[in-house]
Amino acid sequence: MAIKNLQNNNDLSELLVSVRRVTTVTKGGRRFSFSILVVVGDEKGRVGCGIGKHAEVAEARVKAVNAAKKSMIRVYLREGRTLHHDIKAKFCSGEIVLRTARAGTGIIAGGAIRSVFEVLGIKDVVAKSTRSNNPHNVICAVFKAFDSMLSPRQVASKRGKKISEIVGNR
């Protein structure tokens, strides 16, 4: 259930990943509100996710978009279309595997992972989500994977080698 909306400011695109009705039980009865998960990106390597809660859906969406804009991170892409290397990550019970792909492969991913790649600007990637299909856990696992991803420049400086030795014949 992803709904795409292109924002005018900074050309950010946002995808609504999930909308849930949640309940707080008080002594006076049940109080209903909405929890919304949104992914925001510029389709050029910057992406963020946010959660918003409010009694009204529209207000919850505004809160989620603002939270996503504040949490944006930069992901360095290979040739502007795929990841630099394969990655595994886990968040709570959500476990994911992200693999690089050749040009023309497309986005082979399901559920919430696909929405992250679409707003990030990745065109070729293979992703698998195991153990959990909870959108929040899966998206947090993707962001954890992005945090652990290293660019060829970072790998070369860690190993004390040249970038050409690391990249090879890609």
UniProtKB/Swiss-Prot annotation:
Name the record gives this protein: Small ribosomal subunit protein uS5
Naturally occurring in which organism (per UniProt): Wolbachia pipientis wMel
GO biological process: translation
Keyword terms of this UniProt record: Ribonucleoprotein, Ribosomal protein, RNA-binding, rRNA-binding
Complex formation: Part of the 30S ribosomal subunit. Contacts proteins S4 and S8.
Domain S5 DRBM, chain residue ranges per copy: 12-75
GO molecular function: rRNA binding; structural constituent of ribosome
Cited HAMAP family: Ribosomal_uS5_B
Family under the similarity heading: Belongs to the universal ribosomal protein uS5 family.
InterPro entries: Ribosomal_Su5_D2-typ_SF (IPR020568), Ribosomal_uS5 (IPR000851), Ribosomal_uS5_bac-type (IPR005712), Ribosomal_uS5_C (IPR005324), Ribosomal_uS5_N (IPR013810), Ribosomal_uS5_N_CS (IPR018192), Ribsml_uS5_D2-typ_fold_subgr (IPR014721)
Domain notes: The N-terminal domain interacts with the head of the 30S subunit; the C-terminal domain interacts with the body and contacts protein S4. The interaction surface between S4 and S5 is involved in control of translational fidelity.
Function, as annotated: With S4 and S12 plays an important role in translational accuracy.
One GO cellular component term: small ribosomal subunit
Source species taxonomy: Bacteria, Pseudomonadati, Pseudomonadota, Alphaproteobacteria, Rickettsiales
